[in-house]
Design a protein with these regions (language model features):
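Extracytosolic ligand-binding ectodomains
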Residues: 1-150
Length: 150
């Protein structure tokens, strides 16, 4: 398991594959951007990632976000773009709620409310501020992330 960003993970995969091309590799969601496949090329083929991002989401809010993102940036949004959009909306909702709850911190508002609308699914925070959600297993195949089907 490689815990690194996409650039470092690609380099580590390259070094490992030179030593043992058949070794099974996994990486953290942090590395699971489209840049990993782009930079890593053949060295990252077959790498497995567990992530909360659903590349095949059919949620209407996600499809709208995806279309708007593609129109503006001429490329698909990945997990950083999607989760940044969701995080921004959580904070904006909390700021709006703060006007009705003066004296409460944004953290207190988020933890008290617990659930917010995300573009792929509801965002639920536990009492520690961690999000709860379904995990999607993907693997890089032919230079792209592909879901691992059971």
């Amino acid at each position: 398991i490689i815990i690194a960003n996409s650039v470092d993970a690609a380099g580590i995969c390259h070094a490992i594959r030179l030593l043992n091309p058949k070794i099974k590799l996994g990486t953290s969601e942090w590395a699971a951007t489209e840049r990993l496949a782009e930079i890593g090329g053949k060295w990252v083929e077959g790498i497995t990632v567990a992530q909360f991002f659903d590349r095949d989401s059919r949620a209407p809010a996600y499809l709208n976000f995806r279309a708007a993102y593609q129109s503006r940036f001429s490329r698909e949004p990945g997990f950083p773009e999607t989760f940044s959009f969701d995080a921004t909306n959580v904070i904006l909702d909390a700021i709006e709620s703060q006007t009705q709850n003066p004296g409460q911190s944004l953290k207190e508002i988020v933890l008290a409310r617990q659930q917010f609308n995300g573009v792929q699914r509801p965002i639920t925070f536990d009492r520690n501020g961690d999000t709860l959600g379904k995990t999607f297993m993907v693997r890089i195949e032919n230079g792209a992330f592909a879901p691992i089907r059971k």
